[in-house]
Amino acid sequence: MTMLAVNNLIAGHGLLTAVRDVSFDVEAGEVLGVIGANGAGKTTLFRTLAGVHSANSGSIALDGVDVTALSASRRVAGGIAMVPEGRRLFVDMTVRENLQVAGENGRSGAWTLSTVLAALPVLTSLLNVVTGGLSGGQRQAVAIGRALMSNPKVLLLDEVSLGLSPVAIEGLYEQLAGLKGRGDTAMIVVEQDLDRAMAFSDRVICMLEGRIALEGRPRVLGKPAITEAYFGLTHPESTHA
C-alpha cells in the first residue's frame, strides 16, 4: 500500500531551485534511504514534504490524499512527522513534556506515552529530566519519540546520526530497527553514512543537484554504483534498479 506518493516535485529557496522534478513512492512499513552530498537538495526535500517549505509545482499525496497545499501543522495531524536535523527540542522542558506536547497536536492512534517508552526504553529513566541536559544520543531518541507521539503514517528522519558517537549511533539504529520491524509506518531517512544507509534501507535514492540520480534496492545497485552517483560520476538522468 502506497503511503506517500511524490510526483514531479519542484521546490527551492527564492530564486534557487533545490529540488528538481523529483518523483518516488514509499510503501507502508518500507524504509527509503535518501543519500547525496551536501547541497544535493535532501533537506529542502524533507522540509517540503513536511510542509515547512512550499512546493513550486508537483504533488505530494499521503495515503491517497493530496496534501501539497496543506500547512505543516495540518500535515502532522494527517500523519507526516519529521525528526529534523539538530533535533529542535524544547530544551527547557522535560522529556515527558516534550512527548506530551507532540501527543496533543498529532493524530490519535497506537502511539501513546507507554508504547513510545516500550519502543524507546532509553527514555524511561529520563522522563523527568530537562531535555537541555541530555547527551546527543539521548536527545535524538527524544526527538524520535516526540515524532512517534503524533502517530505518523510517514516518519521523516533527517541526518539522524549527525554528531553522535559511534556507540550512540549503534543504539539509535537498534531502536529504529525495532520501529521498522513493526511494519506499520513508512520511514524516509537521510543518512550520510553510505554503509549504514545501504544496510538499513529497503530502497535508496541518491540525489544530485536536486534530482534523483540513482534509485533502487541497495543490494541490486551495489556500493560502487551508489558511490559514483553520490559524487556525480554517473549520467544525471535517474537510473532505477
Annotated model-derived regions:
Residues 35-37:
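The feature captures the beta-strand-to-loop junction immediately N-terminal to the Walker
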